[in-house]
Amino acid sequence: MPPRLCVRCNTSRAMLNRPKTQEQVCRECFFTAFEEEVHQTIVDNKLFKHGERLAVAASGGKDSTVLAHIMSTLNARYNYGLDLFLLSIDEGITGYRDDSLETVKRNEQQYGIPLKVVSYKELYGWTMDEIVSQIGTKNNCTFCGVFRRQALDRGAVLMGANKIATGHNADDVAETVLLNILRGDVPRLGRCANIITGEDSSLPRVKPFKYAYEKEIVLYAYYKKLDYFSTECIYAPFAARGFAREFIKDLEAARPLAIIDVIRSAEDFVFAAASDEKLPQPRTCERCGYISSQPVCKACVLLEGLNRGMPRLGVSRTRGRRGEKAGLHPDVGRGGGGGSSGPAEVASPVEIVYETT
Protein backbone atom coordinates (compact mmCIF):
# COMPACT_ATOMS: atom_id res chain seq x y z
CA MET A 1 0.00 0.00 0.00
CA PRO A 2 1.48 3.39 -0.96
CA PRO A 3 2.08 5.88 1.87
CA ARG A 4 -0.74 8.28 2.67
CA LEU A 5 -0.24 11.73 1.22
CA CYS A 6 -0.81 15.00 3.03
CA VAL A 7 -4.35 16.22 2.35
CA ARG A 8 -3.09 19.79 2.04
CA CYS A 9 -0.13 19.60 -0.33
CA ASN A 10 -0.91 16.16 -1.79
CA THR A 11 2.80 15.58 -2.37
CA SER A 12 4.52 14.85 0.95
CA ARG A 13 3.84 11.86 3.15
CA ALA A 14 1.26 12.41 5.89
CA MET A 15 3.02 12.24 9.25
CA LEU A 16 0.28 13.04 11.72
CA ASN A 17 -3.44 13.36 12.34
CA ARG A 18 -4.35 16.88 13.44
CA PRO A 19 -6.25 16.52 16.75
CA LYS A 20 -8.31 19.62 15.99
CA THR A 21 -9.46 18.82 12.44
CA GLN A 22 -8.57 15.12 12.05
CA GLU A 23 -6.69 16.01 8.84
CA GLN A 24 -3.78 13.78 7.83
CA VAL A 25 -0.95 16.20 7.09
CA CYS A 26 2.80 16.36 6.65
CA ARG A 27 4.94 18.20 9.17
CA GLU A 28 5.50 21.30 7.05
CA CYS A 29 1.80 21.70 6.29
CA PHE A 30 1.02 21.23 9.98
CA PHE A 31 3.50 23.96 10.92
CA THR A 32 2.03 26.29 8.31
CA ALA A 33 -1.58 25.58 9.31
CA PHE A 34 -0.88 26.04 13.02
CA GLU A 35 1.01 29.31 12.53
CA GLU A 36 -1.53 30.71 10.10
CA GLU A 37 -4.43 29.91 12.42
CA VAL A 38 -2.73 31.74 15.28
CA HIS A 39 -1.98 34.67 12.96
CA GLN A 40 -5.62 34.75 11.88
CA THR A 41 -6.73 34.76 15.51
CA ILE A 42 -4.44 37.72 16.18
CA VAL A 43 -5.66 39.65 13.13
CA ASP A 44 -9.37 38.87 13.49
CA ASN A 45 -9.39 39.95 17.13
CA LYS A 46 -7.03 42.93 16.70
CA LEU A 47 -4.89 41.71 19.59
CA PHE A 48 -1.95 44.04 18.93
CA LYS A 49 -1.10 47.43 17.54
CA HIS A 50 2.09 48.31 15.73
CA GLY A 51 4.75 49.59 18.12
CA GLU A 52 3.33 48.04 21.28
CA ARG A 53 5.64 46.56 23.89
CA LEU A 54 4.47 43.01 24.64
CA ALA A 55 5.30 40.92 27.69
CA VAL A 56 5.24 37.23 26.75
CA ALA A 57 4.49 35.34 29.95
CA ALA A 58 7.12 32.59 30.05
CA SER A 59 7.20 29.62 32.41
CA GLY A 60 9.46 27.38 30.35
CA GLY A 61 6.60 24.96 29.73
CA LYS A 62 5.27 23.86 26.36
CA ASP A 63 2.56 26.53 25.99
CA SER A 64 4.71 29.52 26.85
CA THR A 65 7.72 28.21 24.91
CA VAL A 66 5.63 27.68 21.77
CA LEU A 67 4.05 31.10 22.35
CA ALA A 68 7.48 32.76 22.50
CA HIS A 69 8.54 30.93 19.33
CA ILE A 70 5.30 31.75 17.48
CA MET A 71 5.24 35.41 18.50
CA SER A 72 8.87 35.83 17.46
CA THR A 73 8.17 34.11 14.13
CA LEU A 74 4.93 35.93 13.29
CA ASN A 75 6.25 39.29 14.47
CA ALA A 76 9.04 39.03 11.90
CA ARG A 77 6.95 37.41 9.15
CA TYR A 78 4.02 39.82 9.24
CA ASN A 79 5.77 42.91 10.57
CA TYR A 80 3.60 43.30 13.67
CA GLY A 81 6.10 45.85 14.89
CA LEU A 82 5.97 44.51 18.45
CA ASP A 83 8.73 45.03 21.00
CA LEU A 84 8.82 41.60 22.67
CA PHE A 85 10.28 40.52 25.98
CA LEU A 86 9.89 37.40 28.11
CA LEU A 87 8.45 37.81 31.59
CA SER A 88 8.92 34.98 34.09
CA ILE A 89 7.73 34.62 37.66
CA ASP A 90 9.90 32.80 40.18
CA GLU A 91 7.45 31.48 42.76
CA GLY A 92 10.21 29.86 44.76
CA ILE A 93 9.34 26.18 44.23
CA THR A 94 12.49 24.11 44.66
CA GLY A 95 12.90 21.32 42.15
CA TYR A 96 10.41 22.87 39.76
CA ARG A 97 10.62 26.59 39.10
CA ASP A 98 14.39 26.81 39.51
CA ASP A 99 14.78 24.16 36.79
CA SER A 100 12.14 25.64 34.47
CA LEU A 101 13.76 29.08 34.70
CA GLU A 102 16.92 27.59 33.23
CA THR A 103 14.81 26.64 30.20
CA VAL A 104 13.48 30.19 29.92
CA LYS A 105 17.03 31.55 30.06
CA ARG A 106 17.95 29.29 27.14
CA ASN A 107 14.84 30.51 25.28
CA GLU A 108 16.08 34.06 25.77
CA GLN A 109 19.23 33.18 23.84
CA GLN A 110 17.46 31.01 21.25
CA TYR A 111 14.90 33.65 20.25
CA GLY A 112 16.91 36.76 20.97
CA ILE A 113 14.16 38.09 23.24
CA PRO A 114 15.22 39.80 26.50
CA LEU A 115 14.07 38.24 29.77
CA LYS A 116 12.81 39.75 33.01
CA VAL A 117 12.39 37.54 36.10
CA VAL A 118 10.28 38.71 39.05
CA SER A 119 10.20 36.65 42.24
CA TYR A 120 7.64 36.19 44.99
CA LYS A 121 10.44 36.63 47.51
CA GLU A 122 11.33 40.12 46.33
CA LEU A 123 7.69 41.20 45.94
CA TYR A 124 6.06 39.55 48.94
CA GLY A 125 8.88 38.35 51.19
CA TRP A 126 7.73 34.73 50.84
CA THR A 127 8.46 31.83 48.51
CA MET A 128 5.77 29.26 47.68
CA ASP A 129 7.79 26.60 49.50
CA GLU A 130 7.68 28.77 52.63
CA ILE A 131 3.96 29.40 52.19
CA VAL A 132 3.19 25.70 51.75
CA SER A 133 5.19 24.91 54.88
CA GLN A 134 2.78 27.20 56.74
CA ILE A 135 -0.57 26.34 55.13
CA GLY A 136 -0.08 22.84 53.74
CA THR A 137 -0.98 21.70 50.22
CA LYS A 138 -4.76 22.04 50.36
CA ASN A 139 -5.10 25.74 49.51
CA ASN A 140 -1.66 26.64 48.20
CA CYS A 141 -3.01 27.34 44.68
CA THR A 142 -5.20 30.06 46.20
CA PHE A 143 -2.10 31.97 47.30
CA CYS A 144 -0.13 31.23 44.15
CA GLY A 145 -2.92 32.28 41.79
CA VAL A 146 -3.35 35.68 43.41
CA PHE A 147 0.36 36.36 43.84
CA ARG A 148 1.24 35.19 40.35
CA ARG A 149 -1.35 37.36 38.64
CA GLN A 150 -0.20 40.45 40.51
CA ALA A 151 3.47 39.60 39.95
CA LEU A 152 2.92 39.36 36.19
CA ASP A 153 1.21 42.74 36.15
CA ARG A 154 3.90 44.36 38.28
CA GLY A 155 6.72 42.92 36.21
CA ALA A 156 5.05 44.03 32.99
CA VAL A 157 4.46 47.56 34.29
CA LEU A 158 8.06 47.73 35.51
CA MET A 159 9.25 46.88 31.98
CA GLY A 160 6.89 49.35 30.30
CA ALA A 161 4.64 46.76 28.62
CA ASN A 162 1.37 47.69 26.94
CA LYS A 163 -0.06 44.15 27.08
CA ILE A 164 0.66 40.67 28.40
CA ALA A 165 0.35 37.62 26.14
CA THR A 166 -0.33 34.36 27.96
CA GLY A 167 -0.21 30.79 26.68
CA HIS A 168 -3.76 29.84 27.62
CA ASN A 169 -4.96 27.39 24.99
CA ALA A 170 -8.38 26.13 23.90
CA ASP A 171 -8.35 23.37 26.51
CA ASP A 172 -7.69 25.94 29.26
CA VAL A 173 -10.52 28.19 28.10
CA ALA A 174 -12.96 25.27 27.90
CA GLU A 175 -11.96 24.18 31.41
CA THR A 176 -12.58 27.70 32.67
CA VAL A 177 -16.04 27.78 31.10
CA LEU A 178 -16.88 24.45 32.73
CA LEU A 179 -15.61 25.56 36.14
CA ASN A 180 -17.68 28.74 36.06
CA ILE A 181 -20.77 26.72 35.10
CA LEU A 182 -20.19 24.33 38.00
CA ARG A 183 -19.66 27.25 40.37
CA GLY A 184 -22.72 29.11 39.15
CA ASP A 185 -20.64 32.23 38.53
CA VAL A 186 -22.88 33.95 35.98
CA PRO A 187 -20.98 37.26 35.60
CA ARG A 188 -17.67 35.54 34.89
CA LEU A 189 -19.35 32.91 32.74
CA GLY A 190 -20.43 35.76 30.50
CA ARG A 191 -16.86 36.90 29.91
CA CYS A 192 -14.53 34.00 30.74
CA ALA A 193 -14.11 33.08 27.06
CA ASN A 194 -13.00 36.58 26.09
CA ILE A 195 -9.74 36.58 24.16
CA ILE A 196 -8.81 39.92 25.74
CA THR A 197 -9.25 40.44 29.47
CA GLY A 198 -8.42 43.29 31.79
CA GLU A 199 -9.40 45.94 29.26
CA ASP A 200 -10.77 48.02 32.13
CA SER A 201 -7.31 48.07 33.71
CA SER A 202 -4.06 49.61 32.53
CA LEU A 203 -2.65 46.29 31.30
CA PRO A 204 -4.83 44.04 29.11
CA ARG A 205 -4.04 40.34 28.69
CA VAL A 206 -4.42 38.51 25.40
CA LYS A 207 -4.65 34.83 24.48
CA PRO A 208 -3.25 34.17 20.97
CA PHE A 209 -3.72 30.41 21.56
CA LYS A 210 -7.40 30.65 22.48
CA TYR A 211 -8.41 28.31 19.63
CA ALA A 212 -5.24 26.19 19.62
CA TYR A 213 -5.60 22.67 21.01
CA GLU A 214 -3.17 21.60 23.71
CA LYS A 215 -2.33 18.42 21.77
CA GLU A 216 -1.39 20.46 18.72
CA ILE A 217 0.83 22.72 20.81
CA VAL A 218 2.61 19.59 22.07
CA LEU A 219 2.98 18.28 18.51
CA TYR A 220 4.30 21.63 17.31
CA ALA A 221 6.89 21.74 20.10
CA TYR A 222 7.88 18.12 19.46
CA TYR A 223 8.32 18.33 15.68
CA LYS A 224 10.00 21.74 15.91
CA LYS A 225 12.31 20.29 18.58
CA LEU A 226 11.69 23.28 20.84
CA ASP A 227 13.45 23.48 24.18
CA TYR A 228 10.83 23.33 26.94
CA PHE A 229 10.39 22.06 30.49
CA SER A 230 7.82 19.29 30.82
CA THR A 231 7.68 18.54 34.55
CA GLU A 232 4.43 19.42 36.30
CA CYS A 233 4.41 21.72 39.31
CA ILE A 234 4.94 19.60 42.43
CA TYR A 235 1.85 21.17 44.01
CA ALA A 236 -0.39 20.77 40.92
CA PRO A 237 -1.98 17.42 41.95
CA PHE A 238 -3.81 19.29 44.70
CA ALA A 239 -5.45 21.80 42.31
CA ALA A 240 -9.22 21.56 41.78
CA ARG A 241 -8.89 22.48 38.10
CA GLY A 242 -7.53 19.00 37.39
CA PHE A 243 -11.02 17.49 37.64
CA ALA A 244 -12.36 19.85 34.95
CA ARG A 245 -9.32 19.08 32.80
CA GLU A 246 -10.00 15.36 32.91
CA PHE A 247 -13.64 15.91 31.94
CA ILE A 248 -12.66 18.07 28.97
CA LYS A 249 -10.19 15.39 27.85
CA ASP A 250 -12.97 12.79 27.99
CA LEU A 251 -15.19 15.02 25.85
CA GLU A 252 -12.41 15.52 23.33
CA ALA A 253 -11.79 11.77 23.11
CA ALA A 254 -15.45 11.19 22.27
CA ARG A 255 -15.74 14.18 19.93
CA PRO A 256 -12.65 16.25 19.01
CA LEU A 257 -14.67 19.39 18.24
CA ALA A 258 -16.16 19.40 21.75
CA ILE A 259 -13.48 21.79 23.01
CA ILE A 260 -14.26 24.41 20.39
CA ASP A 261 -17.99 23.85 20.88
CA VAL A 262 -17.67 24.64 24.60
CA ILE A 263 -15.78 27.83 23.80
CA ARG A 264 -18.23 28.91 21.10
CA SER A 265 -21.14 28.27 23.45
CA ALA A 266 -19.58 30.54 26.06
CA GLU A 267 -19.00 33.23 23.44
CA ASP A 268 -22.71 33.10 22.57
CA PHE A 269 -23.97 33.15 26.16
CA VAL A 270 -26.27 36.07 26.93
CA PHE A 271 -27.33 36.48 30.54
CA ALA A 272 -29.83 39.03 31.73
CA ALA A 273 -28.34 38.66 35.19
CA ALA A 274 -24.93 39.66 33.91
CA SER A 275 -26.13 43.19 33.25
CA ASP A 276 -27.80 43.44 36.65
CA GLU A 277 -24.98 41.97 38.67
CA LYS A 278 -21.94 43.99 37.69
CA LEU A 279 -18.41 43.02 38.62
CA PRO A 280 -16.81 45.45 41.08
CA GLN A 281 -15.17 48.45 39.45
CA PRO A 282 -11.37 48.55 39.69
CA ARG A 283 -9.86 50.83 42.29
CA THR A 284 -6.50 51.15 44.01
CA CYS A 285 -5.53 49.02 47.00
CA GLU A 286 -5.19 51.18 50.11
CA ARG A 287 -2.04 49.32 51.16
CA CYS A 288 0.06 48.51 48.10
CA GLY A 289 -1.46 50.73 45.41
CA TYR A 290 -2.16 47.78 43.11
CA ILE A 291 -5.42 47.68 41.11
CA SER A 292 -8.14 45.94 43.13
CA SER A 293 -11.90 45.50 43.19
CA GLN A 294 -11.86 45.93 46.97
CA PRO A 295 -10.35 48.55 49.31
CA VAL A 296 -7.59 46.05 50.16
CA CYS A 297 -6.38 43.74 47.38
CA LYS A 298 -6.45 39.96 47.74
CA ALA A 299 -2.67 39.72 47.83
CA CYS A 300 -2.48 42.07 50.81
CA VAL A 301 -5.23 40.16 52.63
CA LEU A 302 -3.34 36.89 52.17
CA LEU A 303 -0.02 38.47 53.09
CA GLU A 304 -1.47 39.88 56.30
CA GLY A 305 -2.41 36.41 57.43
CA LEU A 306 1.02 35.04 56.59
CA ASN A 307 2.90 37.87 58.27
CA ARG A 308 0.76 37.66 61.40
CA GLY A 309 1.50 33.96 61.70
CA MET A 310 -2.12 32.99 61.03
CA PRO A 311 -1.99 31.64 57.50
CA ARG A 312 -4.45 28.79 57.63
CA LEU A 313 -7.25 29.22 55.15
CA GLY A 314 -10.71 27.85 55.74
CA VAL A 315 -12.25 27.46 52.31
CA SER A 316 -16.00 27.31 51.91
CA ARG A 317 -17.29 27.20 48.37
CA THR A 318 -20.43 29.16 47.74
CA ARG A 319 -22.81 29.64 44.88
CA GLY A 320 -22.74 32.62 42.60
CA ARG A 321 -20.54 35.54 43.63
CA ARG A 322 -21.50 35.84 47.27
CA GLY A 323 -17.90 35.35 48.36
CA GLU A 324 -16.46 38.05 46.13
CA LYS A 325 -19.14 40.54 47.12
CA ALA A 326 -17.95 40.16 50.69
CA GLY A 327 -14.42 40.94 49.61
CA LEU A 328 -13.39 37.30 49.69
CA HIS A 329 -10.81 35.60 47.57
CA PRO A 330 -11.46 33.78 44.27
CA ASP A 331 -9.38 30.69 43.61
CA VAL A 332 -7.70 31.62 40.37
CA GLY A 333 -4.96 30.03 38.41
CA ARG A 334 -4.03 26.81 36.79
CA GLY A 335 -2.23 24.27 38.85
CA GLY A 336 0.07 23.26 36.14
CA GLY A 337 3.57 22.79 35.15
CA GLY A 338 4.58 23.55 31.66
CA GLY A 339 1.48 25.35 30.60
CA SER A 340 0.41 28.90 30.43
CA SER A 341 1.64 31.64 32.62
CA GLY A 342 -0.99 33.40 34.59
CA PRO A 343 -4.54 32.51 35.57
CA ALA A 344 -7.53 32.30 33.34
CA GLU A 345 -10.74 34.19 34.05
CA VAL A 346 -11.99 31.91 36.82
CA ALA A 347 -13.57 32.69 40.13
CA SER A 348 -14.07 30.31 42.99
CA PRO A 349 -15.54 32.23 45.90
CA VAL A 350 -13.88 31.24 49.14
CA GLU A 351 -14.02 32.53 52.64
CA ILE A 352 -10.78 33.54 54.28
CA VAL A 353 -10.68 32.43 57.90
CA TYR A 354 -7.50 33.04 59.82
CA GLU A 355 -6.90 30.49 62.54
CA THR A 356 -4.12 30.23 65.02
CA THR A 357 -2.09 27.06 64.69
Curated annotation (Swiss-Prot):
Keywords: Cytoplasm, RNA-binding, Transferase, tRNA processing, tRNA-binding. It is found in: Cytoplasm. InterPro entries: CTU1-like_ATP-bd, CTU1_C, Ncs6/Tuc1/Ctu1, Rossmann-like_a/b/a_fold, TilS/TtcA_N, tRNA_thiolation_TtcA_Ctu1. Pathway: tRNA modification; 5-methoxycarbonylmethyl-2-thiouridine-tRNA biosynthesis. The keyword tRNA processing applies. One of its GO terms (molecular function) is nucleotidyltransferase activity. GO terms for cellular component: cytoplasm. PANTHER family: ATPASES OF THE PP SUPERFAMILY-RELATED, CYTOPLASMIC TRNA 2-THIOLATION PROTEIN 1. This is Cytoplasmic tRNA 2-thiolation protein 1. It comes from Chlamydomonas reinhardtii. The lineage of its organism: Eukaryota, Viridiplantae, Chlorophyta, core chlorophytes, Chlorophyceae.
